[in-house]
């Protein structure tokens, strides 16, 4: 079996027969050059599963789930509340934090926040790709913008670790 892992948003179970969406089918067939009969991995909150390609029709891959590789796991909740920064750096933060195990991203609005709009579709794509590459089973969530005072008030009984580059300690 190859090391190709894809996130599958629908429920997975043994002997399930389903189809990949167009971008995932394109990735497997045209980029990774996988053919009928070959295997790859699918994962989501149901765990990680081995799937075998049954058919490739008009560029869409139909597969069957043949084996459970890993059960789902309960990760510790690690949230990253952040004030959005310029695009390239934000993409890197999202990618690396996903690889390190963050389970939820919360963009925070402060008085000095310059970036006030996020491309959620793009960030979710980065989150999924980082989850695929880092062997995670759960894909972190991306919340809507929250004002700093609202975030702090709603999380008063939560341990918050604050990082500030401008302090000595």
Regions found by a protein language model. Name each.
Residues 1-71, 121:
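N-terminal positively charged helical leader segments and presequences
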Residues 71-162:
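RNA substrate-binding interface of SAM-dependent RNA methyltransferases
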Residues 166:
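Carbohydrate-associated surface elements
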Residues 169:
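Short, glycine/charge-rich flexible loops or terminal/linker lids adjacent to PRPP-binding catalytic cores
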């Amino acid at each position: 079996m190859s090391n190709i892992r894809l996130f599958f948003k629908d429920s997975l179970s043994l002997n399930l027969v389903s189809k990949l969406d167009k971008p995932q089918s394109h990735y497997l067939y045209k980029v990774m050059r996988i053919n009928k009969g070959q295997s790859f991995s699918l994962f989501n909150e149901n765990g990680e599963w081995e799937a075998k390609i049954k058919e490739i029709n008009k560029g869409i891959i139909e597969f069957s789930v043949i084996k459970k590789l890993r059960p789902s796991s309960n990760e510790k909740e690690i949230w990253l509340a952040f004030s959005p920064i310029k695009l390239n750096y934000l993409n890197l933060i999202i990618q690396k934090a996903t690889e390190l195990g963050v389970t939820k991203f919360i963009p925070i609005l402060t008085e000095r926040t310059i970036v006030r709009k996020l491309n959620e579709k793009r960030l979710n794509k980065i989150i999924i790709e980082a989850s695929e590459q880092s062997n995670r089973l759960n894909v972190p969530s991306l919340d809507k913008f929250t004002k700093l005072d609202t975030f702090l008030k709603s999380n008063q009984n939560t341990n918050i670790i604050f990082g500030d580059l401008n302090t000595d300690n």
